[in-house]
């Protein structure tokens, strides 16, 4: 992990890093993009880490960002199907990992936030997540807690009364941009030239991934890096198949409610049917009905269950879903808005097994065994 460690030396020195290409990534990943408006420093990262883990920022004092994005669970809340917020309230979506979220061009499953800074503000005030009525309780804490006051002054050169949610969001985002992980057996095999790094089943699975499985169409691998996502949105038949008969009535009613001021962030996490509208809830484009963001496959073996709704329990279930053409069982009706590339694959049992083995080879070393928070954040191995 030398490339990442070297980048962290610059952060630890408190250096303001260059625009948009600041933190070198580990083997297999590109540099982490850093916005010009939110340069990285070690002090800002440390502040963001504390904010990320502070349970006082929920209405019950029992939930933090880390509750659903647990470092010990690859920054998810595995094995929960959908996340639990305050008072054990259950939302509609599976918690996506924060690992490598810095590389996404949109945040949330439906892409309703453009960046980590914007994304970080919403869970605080969602009724089924952290349940605050507004952001004022957070500002009250950070403006009065002596340690926060000192940290915000050091990082942003601001007095307590001038601390804003923008400062909070910037610090959390800075912390999240340090949570990157590559250097998997696949990376060592493909980018490091170590042909012994993957076992035979994973090597065969890699060929299925590139060929008959057609996985690489969306989970992109490039010559010198692999994000394993195209940063686009697709209807792959998960979730929306259950509500397809409701769509003619549901979609126009949602658009009408949205025009009247419906809070989309709250609606998609509280109403299961509304949640399944996917990217359509943001863009209102019929071609994005039931479409969700392509997740990265890095460390996917550590983040079960799968899909935006957690409806598929194992990696084998996921492969079978695609092999059946976007349905759990062959012969089931597919929705009318299924993305064009989704069709039956006719993979053999051996190919399915090998494909799972390949995805397991995408696990970074810090997630291959019980991890420590310091190792995860620093990008090293425990």
Identify what each model region corresponds to.
Residues 2-5, 20-382:
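Periplasmic c-type cytochrome electron-transfer domains
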Residues 10-22:
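Bacterial N-terminal signal peptides
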């Amino acid at each position: 992990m030398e490339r990442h460690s070297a980048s962290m030396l610059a952060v630890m020195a408190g250096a303001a890093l260059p625009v948009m290409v600041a933190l070198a990534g580990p083997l297999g990943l590109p540099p982490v993009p850093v916005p010009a408006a939110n340069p990285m420093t070690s002090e800002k990262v440390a502040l963001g880490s504390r904010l990320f883990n502070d349970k006082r920022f929920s209405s019950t004092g029992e939930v933090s960002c880390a509750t659903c994005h647990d470092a010990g669970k690859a920054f998810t809340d595995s094995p929960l199907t959908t996340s639990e917020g305050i008072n054990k309230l259950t939302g509609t979506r599976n918690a996506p990992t924060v690992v490598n979220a810095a590389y996404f061009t949109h945040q949330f499953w439906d892409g309703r936030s453009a960046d980590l800074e914007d994304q970080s503000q919403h869970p605080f005030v969602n009724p089924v997540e952290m349940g605050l009525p507004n952001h004022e309780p957070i500002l009250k804490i950070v403006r009065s807690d002596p340690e926060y006051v000192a940290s915000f002054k050091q990082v942003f050169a601001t007095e307590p009364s001038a601390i804003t949610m923008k400062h909070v969001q910037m610090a959390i985002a800075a912390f999240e941009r340090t949570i990157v992980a590559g250097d998997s057996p696949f990376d060592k095999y493909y980018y490091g030239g170590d042909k012994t790094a993957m076992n035979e089943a994973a090597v065969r699975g890699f060929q299925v991934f590139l060929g008959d499985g057609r996985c690489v169409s969306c989970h992109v691998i490039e010559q010198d890096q692999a994000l394993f996502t195209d940063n686009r949105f697709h209807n792959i038949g998960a979730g929306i198949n259950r509500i397809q008969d409701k769509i003619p009535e549901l979609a126009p009613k949602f658009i009408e409610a949205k025009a009247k001021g419906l809070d989309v962030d709250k609606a998609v996490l509280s109403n299961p049917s509304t949640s399944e509208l996917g990217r359509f809830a943001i863009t209102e484009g019929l071609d994005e009905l039931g479409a969700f963001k392509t997740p990265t496959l890095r460390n996917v073996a550590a983040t079960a269950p799968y899909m935006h709704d957690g409806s598929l329990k194992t990696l084998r279930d996921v492969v079978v879903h695609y092999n059946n053409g976007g349905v759990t069982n062959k012969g089931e009706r597919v929705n009318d808005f299924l993305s064009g590339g989704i069709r039956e694959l006719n993979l053999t049992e051996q190919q399915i097994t090998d494909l799972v083995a390949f995805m397991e080879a995408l696990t970074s070393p810090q997630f291959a065994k019980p991890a420590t928070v310091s190792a995860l954040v620093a990008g090293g191995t425990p």
